[in-house]
Amino acid sequence: MTYDTKVTALIMAGKRSGALDPLAERAGVAQKAVVPVNGVPMVARVADAIAACPEVATIRIIAHEPDEIAAQPGIAKLIEEGRLSFAPGKFNIVDSVFSGAEDADFPLLITTADNCLVTPEGYSEFIGKCLEAQAGGAAGLARKEDVQAADPEGQKRFYEFRDGGFSNCNMYWIGSAKALSAAEIMREGGQFVKFPRRIIKAFGLVNLIRFRFGTGSKEKLFEQVSKRFGFKLVPVELSDGHFAIDVDNERTFAVTEKILKRREGDRTSA
């Protein structure tokens, strides 16, 4: 099924206050978003993939230091074409999302600057499934077995539900201005596998118990959260486990670069 809806894409490219990311320090750059992976800055890879997705009209990068990002050739080209602009990063991820969403045309696709393995087809798959579900909000997930098949070192932690293990793909959907309140789920920083107590504040105690003991399905969890927010939130299962592997540290950097070299050849000396 095809849809005429055009999407605004937000790329979260902020940096943590007061600390230089270790990957950025090693690469000799000021922020993680411009660290090269197989010869191409991370944020440029993500922007290129999104720009090649036919469902996306405009792109906004939310950044604390936009000048270094804007100087990247691929980014500069998209700016010149009028497809890409910047919004200021804020103190936390939720307020940064609100900054990026200001005066934007909905629906919104939200992703991160380190999501280097998602293809244009992957973004299209996510957008299509969100539209088909008529979702007010959504999160992209990949099955544990698919992620491990992509690379066994790509992810170490998974959300365990009654219907299997899943990993977050750092793809989110905000269907309308009303649904923007769903971003509050991330107010404490997300990373619920690492910090389960955050689920109490975001989802409630009963859902924390279901999450910890794998007694509920992902659909049930999203259904309960939908009731809390007053609009439809859905889990979107994606077909490729690579989409759940992003660049968080040296291990996942090495995994991502290895996969990219396999896809496109070695570009580190280009």
Residue map of PLM features:
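Conserved active-site beta-strand element of glycosyltransferases/polysaccharide synthases
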Residues: 234-237, 246
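Short catalytic helix/loop segments, enriched in acidic residues and glycine
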Residues: 26-45
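Short, conserved phosphate/pyrophosphate- and ester-handling motifs at nucleotide-, phospho-/glycolipid
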Residues: 249
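Conserved N-terminal catalytic core of the sugar/cofactor nucleotidyltransferase
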Residues: 2-11, 40-107, 215-216
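Conserved core of the sugar-phosphate nucleotidyltransferase
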Residues: 119-226, 238-242
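Short beta-strand-to-loop acidic/aromatic patch adjacent to the donor-nucleotide binding site
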Residues: 106-114
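Short amphipathic alpha-helices within nucleic acid-binding modules
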Residues: 253-258
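N-terminal nucleotide-binding beta1-loop-alpha1 segment
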Residues: 1-28
